[in-house]
Amino acid sequence: SHPEIDVIEEKPLINSVEQLIKSKFKYSLDELHKLSSKDLEILRNHYLEILKSNCDNKNAKILIDKFPFQTVCLPLINLLFPNSKIIFTHRNPYDTVLSCFQQSFEPNNAMSNFRNIEAASKIYDLTMSIWLDYKTKLKINFITSKYEDLIEDFENHILKILNYLDISWDENIKNYRNTAHKRGKINTPSSSQVVQPLYKSSISKWKNYEKYF
């Protein structure tokens, strides 16, 4: 809802770069160090071209790629865009697992991990372990955003993120629901919630299902 920011829907854009590394340069993702400066420039331009083609706001100063499975891609992202800013969003682990389990995802290899609570818990644990490892070993510029903090104090929490992005506050941010409505179809698993007001009922919701954890 900020005029200077465009958020790209949850699309695996970085996967296209990974495929190009394998098909064009014949390297595995464990061989990123073998890529030359020229190779990186080609890959960088490839990603940016795809990213911009998926933008709604062509005048946006900042583009946010919010594909949720990009944690495992941080080494590649950091290599291509060492000055990029990472916003790591998280919430209570139990609520995260429950929410993923309750979503109606389009079937694919990644989403199959959410077919039951146990499998969802394992993929969450793996993802968080990867994050904890990468954030100490990689020189990444990041800020964390906790869902519960957002619910508790929306304006101050958003302001903290805007300051990190070097963007000023805009009153239109409060109208995020109207912005979502105007976009029409939203291709995210939680699309029905995007147009809803922020609510506290989702906090600690997992306790209603505690016996399943």
Please place each PLM-identified region on the residue numbering:
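Phosphate-binding active sites in nucleotide-utilizing proteins
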Residues: S1-F81, T89-H90
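Hydrophobic/aromatic beta-strand patches that form the interior of the parallel beta-sheet core
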Residues: D6, K85-I87, I143-S145
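Conserved nucleotide-binding/hydrolysis micro-motifs of P-loop NTPases
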Residues: P12-I14, R91-T96, D149-I151
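PAPS-dependent sulfotransferases, especially Golgi type II membrane carbohydrate sulfotransferases
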Residues: L20-I21, Y27-K61, V97-T144, E152-F213
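Conserved coil-to-alpha-helix start sites within the AMP-binding
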Residues: T71-L74, D95-T96, M128
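Conserved phosphate-donor/acceptor-positioning beta-strand/loop module used by diverse small-molecule
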Residues: L76-Q102, I161
